[in-house]
Amino acid sequence: MPPKTRSGARRSGRRVVKKNVANGHAYIKSTFNNTIVSITDPNGAVISWASSGHVGFKGSRKSTPFAAQMAAESAARKAQEHGLKKVEVFVKGPGSGRETAIRSLQAAGLEVNSISDVTPQPHNGCRPPKRRRV
C-alpha cells in the first residue's frame, strides 16, 4: 500500500473575519513591566490587540512610554482596517505608558470619546509585596 500524501498544505489558526464596527472600546493595561492594548467592539469581542512585547521590545524596554506608543499605534491600525472610528478608553494599572498610549490612539486617527480609569483599588485585601531595598 503506497504512503498517504497530503494534497495541499493545511493552515492552522482562526480565519480572520472582517468586522465592520464604527464604535468600540480600547482597554489599556499598563503595568510596571509591559503595556497591553486591546480594542473591542461594544459587546466586548476583541477586534485587535497589541503589547509592547508583541511589537518587538524585549526586557526592560517593554516598560517604556515609547513601547506603549508603538503598541497602541499597532492596535489602532489593525482596528481601523475593520472600520473602527470612535473609541471609549479604559485605562488600568500604574505603568508609565498610560498617557502615551492614549495620545497615540488619537494620533492614529481614532476619535476618543471618553477616558476612564478602571484601576482596581483594594479595600485592604491582599498583603502587598515586601518593600524593595536598593
Swiss-Prot record:
Span of the signal peptide: none
Source species, domain of life: Bacteria
SUPFAM superfamilies: Translational machinery components (SSF53137)
GO CC list: ribonucleoprotein complex; ribosome
Region (Disordered): 115-134
Membrane-spanning residues: none
Statement: the UniProt record of this protein carries the keyword Transmembrane: no
GO terms for biological process, alphabetical: translation
Pfam families, sorted: Ribosomal_S11
PROSITE patterns from the UniProt entry: RIBOSOMAL_S11
InterPro entries in alphabetical order: Ribosomal_uS11, Ribosomal_uS11_bac-type, Ribosomal_uS11_CS, Ribosomal_uS11_sf
Keywords of this entry: Ribonucleoprotein, Ribosomal protein, RNA-binding, rRNA-binding
Keyword Protein biosynthesis annotated: no
A GO term for molecular function: rRNA binding
Role description: Located on the platform of the 30S subunit, it bridges several disparate RNA helices of the 16S rRNA. Forms part of the Shine-Dalgarno cleft in the 70S ribosome.
Family from the record: Belongs to the universal ribosomal protein uS11 family.
Subunit structure: Part of the 30S ribosomal subunit. Interacts with proteins S7 and S18. Binds to IF-3.
Protein name according to UniProt: Small ribosomal subunit protein uS11
Source organism per UniProt: Corynebacterium kroppenstedtii (strain DSM 44385 / JCM 11950 / CIP 105744 / CCUG 35717)
